[in-house]
Amino acid sequence: MANITVFYNEDFQGKQVDLPPGNYTRAQLAALGIENNTISSVKVPPGVKAILYQNDGFAGDQIEVVANAEELGPLNNNVSSIRVISVPVQPRARFFYKEQFDGKEVDLPPGQYTQAELERYGIDNNTISSVKPQGLAVVLFKNDNFSGDTLPVNSDAPTLGAMNNNTSSIRIS
């Protein structure tokens, strides 16, 4: 069974605590040594997802985290309850910052990712230079919110031509 790991600082730094699947209220997190409103990044391996809530009792603003999240945007240092849910393991497409599958890499499961969501998972705007779909269908979009020029990627792409460092949103299926 896979666990998520929550971190006190962005980029997986600072104090860390592993959480197996389950529901965690503010009191339960405190009992595990996690102070209120201190979580800034989360590692989420295949086989689990996390839903982070702004308020205790699984209320308020929330984000669903399905892959490693280097930062949590509006919920940064603003999480009071968490659900960790087991999910079927799915293949993940791999994105690279440099051509020829080099540089920083980020794996994402099937889904739709806007620019803000890509940044949550560690992909800065206009930084993707090569892709390994790993059996998935990937569509790169030049603009945020799935608009502008597109590039379908169904096999390993060591270079992206005109879309090199020019991607702001992604669909993976």
UniProtKB/Swiss-Prot annotation:
An annotated GO BP: sporulation resulting in formation of a cellular spore
**TM region(s), chain numbering:** none
Where does the chain bind Ca(2+) 1? Answer: 8, 38, 40, 77
Q: Name one Pfam family in it.
A: Crystall
Organism of origin is Myxococcus xanthus
Database matches in PROSITE patterns: CRYSTALLIN_BETA_GAMMA
Function according to Swiss-Prot or TrEMBL:
Protein S, induced in large amounts during fruiting body formation, assembles on the surface of myxospores in the presence of calcium ions.
- Which taxonomic lineage does the organism of this UniProt entry have? Bacteria, Pseudomonadati, Myxococcota, Myxococcia, Myxococcales
Report domain Beta/gamma crystallin 'Greek key' positions: 2-46, 48-86, 91-135, 136-173
What effect is documented for mutating residue 40 to R? Suppresses completely calcium-binding
Annotated region (Connecting peptide) at 87-90
The UniProt comment on domains reads: Has a two-domain beta-structure, folded into four very similar Greek key motifs. The N-terminal domain (NPS) binds 2 calcium ions.
The name this protein goes by in its record: Development-specific protein S
Q: Which UniProt keywords apply?
A: Calcium, Metal-binding, Repeat, Sporulation
**Annotated residues for binding of Ca(2+) 2:** 37, 54, 78, 80
